[in-house]
């Protein structure tokens, strides 16, 4: 998924992504056949995992059933490091979410393509995923997370836990998590049991670290 993100995703006002094909079961089956046990993707030099905890997410529901899922960020710690004079407000450095040039990683190690190149009046590709899931036309799940490039997988696992595995939110939030973003070819994990770690370690490099926080 992160490989396709790198190639196809960007501001849809500027680039026509093949969404229907990317979410089709036929394409998913085709991609799944390319996954080979024990095969590690080549990792280019200069790709680092640097994450801060500055992104903020909140989920709110009121007594009338109105809901809000909001994620906002400066991007990296202290954003651009510039404060708007007389305001105390830090300016972000969201320009890093654009692709400097195809194949060049941003501060989170994410690779971009022409679809996400810098252009005037264009929005950069973001990992922020504030989510509201509806069931029978009513809000069923309100969620989101912080964590830079890990947000996508954190929110996905929250949705899968509650919808596919019928977990309560409190149970889902305490569950172990994993994160893999194509490049670097490293699986980040939080809270996996030893037997699973031993099994996964046979096929890839694992790093234990904190992965996002959902609300």
Predicted regions and their residues:
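Hydrophobic, well-ordered secondary-structure elements that form the walls
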Residues: 1, 65, 132, 155, ...
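Internal maturation/activation junctions in enzymes
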Residues: 2-74, 86-87, 94, 102-103, ...
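Structural signal for hydrophobic packing residues in well-ordered secondary-structure cores
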Residues: 2-9, 35, 39, 95, ...
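Short Gly/Pro-enriched turn/cap motifs at secondary-structure boundaries
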Residues: 47-51, 116-124, 208-212
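Extended hydrophobic
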Residues: 62, 133-134, 140
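Active-site rim segments in enzyme catalytic domains, especially the processed small/beta chain
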Residues: 67-135, 165, 169
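Extended C-terminal subregions enriched in glycine
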Residues: 122, 164-213
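Alpha-helical support elements that line or immediately flank enzyme active sites
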Residues: 145-167
